[in-house]
Amino acid sequence: MKTTAPRTQIRPVTLPDGVSLRRVAQVLLEAWEVGAHQWTGTPLQLREGASAKPSLPLPQDALDLFRLLADRRVDYLLVGGLAMLTYVNGRNTRDVDLLMSAATLRTIPELVIVEESEYFARAAYRSVQVDVLLTKNPLFKQVAQKFATRHRFAELSVPAVTVEGLIVLKLYALPSLYRQFALDRAALYETDITLLIAQHTPKLEPLIALVDQQMKPGDQKELQTILAECKARATLLRQRAGQASSITKPSA
């Protein structure tokens, strides 16, 4: 197996308050450069053939997307991987995830819709892939109404989901991921939830209660178990971080 060498230096993946939107563009580019499409001769490719290579996300396109949304005063929230990076150090993400209504999406002709279902749409803004969560889903609508904040970039502030909203969205997605045997994504989502709990200690009871309203009884029980496990791992992480800090702290 071979892979193309990345052209840019991979940096710590985070989007702290006040960082330039150009960092968003770099995150998307770095994710593209280490993506699975760079590998050749894998068993899957040999068996099924290579899939189409995604387009290279151009940095200027990512900047222009957020400027367009701001100039049009679009009612939306930044969610998904980029929103995660405003709260924790994490992994690269190759697309922009937005939450908005279907009616709002229709007012942005520059977002070319590639696929659409009842609650989701996949679109493209020039070279940038944009995944859209639609507020026709009752839970997504509640997230938009109850869990909105703003993240300040150097150039402008962007409407973004809160820590609590991210946890709600990830909990909601987990049963479907497990039914699809998308175990890699399910594991990543559980890790995301654990990190958000460990670093921000949100109140979890109202969040699971909100998600439960949209779940079948069997899924409700499983999510309670998953959330308890994430909470326990978060507690253990904080304990170990505290122990490491006390060990390395210089004596007076």
Describe the function of each predicted region.
Residues 2-252:
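Compositionally biased terminal segments of proteins
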